[in-house]
């Protein structure tokens, strides 16, 4: 069973995450940050990972802690659900077009966290959501999920489209990487003998 449940509690946030890598993309995400919920829904739908998030944070300050801590918890849940990573494809990449936006994501479930982020936004906010929090989410996801992640904006004029294309591109790359590879059943996808 490639499932996980994580609870993270700090003085700033209380987060619960449940995910199923072998899902159908079902989602039920409630963080108190509307645009972020919309992005998490995209992440689930397009990765085919079932995802449920419940978050309560210090939104009276801003959205930062809620977004970052949700990324931490989802990353931890991914690590738990993947186990020793035997039999997975490990790598994934995708170019995602959404209207004016074109974003490329490539990732390696290597247990070596590293984020390369080449995504600029033409606006600092999408509604009330700070666009810089998109990077914060993926930094937390990469670090706590042990993911080498590259995300590049190739084109884009609209901040909402760019952010959504980034989440969808990462989702499609993740879908590929977590997929069981029948030719590698029970085999670790590394010559090192460990990931």
Swiss-Prot record:
Keyword Cytoplasm (UniProt): yes
Reaction catalysis annotation: D-erythro-1-(imidazol-4-yl)glycerol 3-phosphate = 3-(imidazol-4-yl)-2-oxopropyl phosphate + H2O
EC number(s) reported in the record: 4.2.1.19
Amino-acid biosynthesis recorded as keyword: yes
A molecular-function term among this protein's GO annotations: imidazoleglycerol-phosphate dehydratase activity
Pfam families associated with the record: IGPD
Membrane-crossing residue ranges in chain numbering: none
GO cellular component, one term: cytoplasm
Places the protein is found: Cytoplasm
Keyword vocabulary terms for this entry: Amino-acid biosynthesis, Cytoplasm, Histidine biosynthesis, Lyase
InterPro entries linked: IGPD_sf, ImidazoleglycerolP_deHydtase, ImidazoleglycerP_deHydtase_CS, Ribosomal_Su5_D2-typ_SF
Pathway connected to this protein: Amino-acid biosynthesis; L-histidine biosynthesis; L-histidine from 5-phospho-alpha-D-ribose 1-diphosphate: step 6/9
Main location: cytoplasm
Any Gene Ontology biological process: L-histidine biosynthetic process
Family: Belongs to the imidazoleglycerol-phosphate dehydratase family.
Name this protein carries in UniProt: Imidazoleglycerol-phosphate dehydratase
Species this chain originates from: Paracoccus denitrificans (strain Pd 1222)
Gene, per the UniProt record: hisB
């Amino acid at each position: 069973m490639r499932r996980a449940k994580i609870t993270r509690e700090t003085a700033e946030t209380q987060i619960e995450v449940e995910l199923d890598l072998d899902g159908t993309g079902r989602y039920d995400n409630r963080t108190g940050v509307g645009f972020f919920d919309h992005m998490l829904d995209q992440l689930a739908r397009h990765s085919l990972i079932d995802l449920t998030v419940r978050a309560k944070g210090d939104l009276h300050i801003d959205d930062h802690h809620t977004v970052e801590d949700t990324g931490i918890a989802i990353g931890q849940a991914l690590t738990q659900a993947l186990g020793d990573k035997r039999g997975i494809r490990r790598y994934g990449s995708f170019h995602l077009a959404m209207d004016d936006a074109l974003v490329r994501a490539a990732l390696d479930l290597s247990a070596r966290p590293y984020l390369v982020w080449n995504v600029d936004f033409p606006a600092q906010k999408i509604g009330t959501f700070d666009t810089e929090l998109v990077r914060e989410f993926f930094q937390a996801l990469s670090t706590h999920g042990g993911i080498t992640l590259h995300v590049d904006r190739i084109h884009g004029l609209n901040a909402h489209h760019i952010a959504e294309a980034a989440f969808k591109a990462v989702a499609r790359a993740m879908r590929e990487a977590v997929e069981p590879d029948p030719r590698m059943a029970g085999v670790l996808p590394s010559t090192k003998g460990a990931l």
